């Protein structure tokens, strides 16, 4: 019913489902497409999957209850239906390194997702992470490090993938950490400025697919 109601909104072009990668299968996607067809054949179906990180240990630490395999399966399953697929990534999860960030960009590029949204971790009050944060069990990287990670991610990301977000937002109320107490738009502008100052761009290091090691063929 929700899908039908969303599809009936005047001027709507697509209905996006943002969900976990272990929460879809072919039968579910087929049912969603048929539901949209009951309203209009011109409304597209699209998915966004929350991967967050490619580091399995980090995924377990933040209790995601899924690994990289489930994300890959979700993307490949959705692509069978010729629908747009996006991914959400958090670039400053405790335990993740710059190498994890780069590998995340490479995997999304290899899977040819259509778009990606980047986030910085925010911590809600009364959560497990809030307790660990207050007790010093986890550390959040600096804003400067986050900016560095975003740039590394973008440099390694296929230029064909749309980047729809460089930093996320969350309500100040009820959080113990969010965006280094800096407005999201200011962080966004700092990222763009730093990239311009370095004369760098998305896809600068995108040179690792399609048999890079081959020299003859």
PLM region spans:
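Core AdoMet radical
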Residues: 1, 7-25, 43-70, 117
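Acidic (Asp/Glu)-rich catalytic clusters
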Residues: 2-10, 30-44, 76-80
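Conserved strand-turn element in the central/C-terminal portion of the radical SAM core barrel
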Residues: 22, 50, 55-56, 78-100, ...
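Structural motif corresponding to alpha-helix initiation and N-cap regions
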Residues: 26-29, 147
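Auxiliary Fe-S-binding modules of radical SAM enzymes
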Residues: 109, 115, 123-217
């Amino acid at each position: 019913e929700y899908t039908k109601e969303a599809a009936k909104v005047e001027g709507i072009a697509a209905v996006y489902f943002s969900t976990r990668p272990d929460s879809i299968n072919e039968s579910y996607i087929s049912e969603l497409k048929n539901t949209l067809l009951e309203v209009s054949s011109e409304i597209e179906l699209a998915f966004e999957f929350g991967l967050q990180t490619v580091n399995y240990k980090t995924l377990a630490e933040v209790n995601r209850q899924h690994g990289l395999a489930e994300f890959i399966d979700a993307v490949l399953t959705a692509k069978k239906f010729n629908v747009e697929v996006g991914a959400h990534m958090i670039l400053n999860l405790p335990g993740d390194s710059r190498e994890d960030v780069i590998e995340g960009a490479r995997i999304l590029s290899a899977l040819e997702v259509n778009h990606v949204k980047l986030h910085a971790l925010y911590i809600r009050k009364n959560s497990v992470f809030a307790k660990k944060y207050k007790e010093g069990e986890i550390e959040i990287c600096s804003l400067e490090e986050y900016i560095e990670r975003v740039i590394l991610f973008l440099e390694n990301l296929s230029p064909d993938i749309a980047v729809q977000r460089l930093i996320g937002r969350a309500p100040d109320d009820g959080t113990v950490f969010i965006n280094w107490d800096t407005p999201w738009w200011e962080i966004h502008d700092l990222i763009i400025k730093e990239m311009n100052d370095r004369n760098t761009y998305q896809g600068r290091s995108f040179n690792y697919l399609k048999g890079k090691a081959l020299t003859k063929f």
